[in-house]
UniProtKB/Swiss-Prot annotation:
Keywords: Plasmid. The lineage of its organism: Bacteria, Pseudomonadati, Pseudomonadota, Gammaproteobacteria, Enterobacterales. It comes from the Bacteria. Belongs to the tfa family. This is Tail fiber assembly protein homolog. The keyword Ribosomal protein does not apply. The gene is T. Pfam families: Caudo_TAP (PF02413).
Amino acid sequence: MDNAILNSELIAIQAGNIIVYNYDGGNREYISASTEYLAVGVGIPANSCLDAPGSHKAGYAILRSEDLSSWEYVPDHRGETVYSIDTGNPEEITVLGDYPENTTTIAPLTPYDKWDGEKWVVDTEAQHSAAVEAAETKRQSLIDTAMDSISLIQLKLRAGRKLTQAETTQLNSVLDYIDELNAMDLTTAPDLNWPEKQLSTAS
């Protein structure tokens, strides 16, 4: 079959086949080439052109220029993950173009990393504060658990009932354990040696 012949307005003045290069109507990204049959008086399909794009380049997408007059290469980082240099939060890139401002492709190693302009550095003060806070939470949880373990003994004491020797031993053991917890210097967190609770059971 003969090739189509077009006028200056890209309307066929002779019917036939023609190769067109299609691009997305939204972001103008090159999609594919196709052979189209044009009858006389018919133009090329929407979002297509006659000039071929250049060859593929790694890391780039091929887009039709904004004025639709040529092809251009645009950075393509879609699918990559970048990290906010302000918060360290990850973000997956879903659009064409350069990396977003105030991001880096380098992942922070800890929740306490701060960006120094070139790399992540650990904010040791924030890291230590978090460790101390976690230790305080753990200590209170251990104290609460210990207190729960002697709640029945405390109830008997409040009722004026006499404790058995085993109950007295358990009560003193738990109170000693709580004293050890309260005496801990948590400012050295996370390098702490937690006391072990003596497992004695009242009978």
